[in-house]
């Protein structure tokens, strides 16, 4: 598949929303990229905000194999926290950095097809790329889409999608280069040291050993899927590390490279 190197897909985790300095630094990096003609698409989660909102409503958070279980009664709260609050916090940070952004969700513009991922998870969605017209139009204007991971089935039912998996679908759709940013510098080994490069076999071994588990397992498997689809490495890196962001802006490799 041909890769459009002018689209960089940045996935950011919910922890970023609780770090004003981290958000400002990341948005300044994105603004510099956009000024250089780099198209940037941001995809976000918001797990910490979801947890807060659920707790405030007397509801508990349950996870299964690193994925949030989403009972129907929690869906409106999760959608509000992700497509509403989280999205607008990031849009505010983008505006402050001088970026023209478009707040959106996976449900917009016929962008993806969505279905229930696993009945045990409730209203958790699995998405596949559908139509890139809407996204490509936004990117061509030099604007930055900021996309939440709320999707919609053909019958109008909202679904909660894991943000790493959402970013995977959008990277495939626009043929972009994917970077999964979280609050850790990349994939760490059993001793807490950064692993600079991983392939499918090494990932399977580390999962078996319990070194890669839960949310990182979901993240790394999403990265591997895109790496194999695109035939190019996907980066797992940190928004906390200013030097990684500067290297990223220059197009250099950062964090852990997930190899196809």
From Swiss-Prot:
One BP annotation, GO: L-arginine biosynthetic process
Record's keyword terms, sorted: Amino-acid biosynthesis, Arginine biosynthesis, ATP-binding, Cytoplasm, Kinase, Nucleotide-binding, Transferase
GO cellular component: cytoplasm
Its job: Catalyzes the ATP-dependent phosphorylation of N-acetyl-L-glutamate.
Organism: Shewanella sp. (strain W3-18-1)
Metabolic or biological pathway, per its Swiss-Prot or TrEMBL entry: Amino-acid biosynthesis; L-arginine biosynthesis; N(2)-acetyl-L-ornithine from L-glutamate: step 2/4
Broad enzyme group: transferase
Site features described as Transition state stabilizer, chain residue numbers: 11, 219
Catalytic activity: N-acetyl-L-glutamate + ATP = N-acetyl-L-glutamyl 5-phosphate + ADP
Taxonomy of the source species: Bacteria, Pseudomonadati, Pseudomonadota, Gammaproteobacteria, Alteromonadales
Ligand binding (substrate): 46-47, 68, 160
UniProt protein name: Acetylglutamate kinase
Location relative to the cell: Cytoplasm
GO molecular function: acetylglutamate kinase activity; ATP binding
EC number of this enzyme: 2.7.2.8
Family membership noted in the UniProt record: Belongs to the acetylglutamate kinase family. ArgB subfamily.
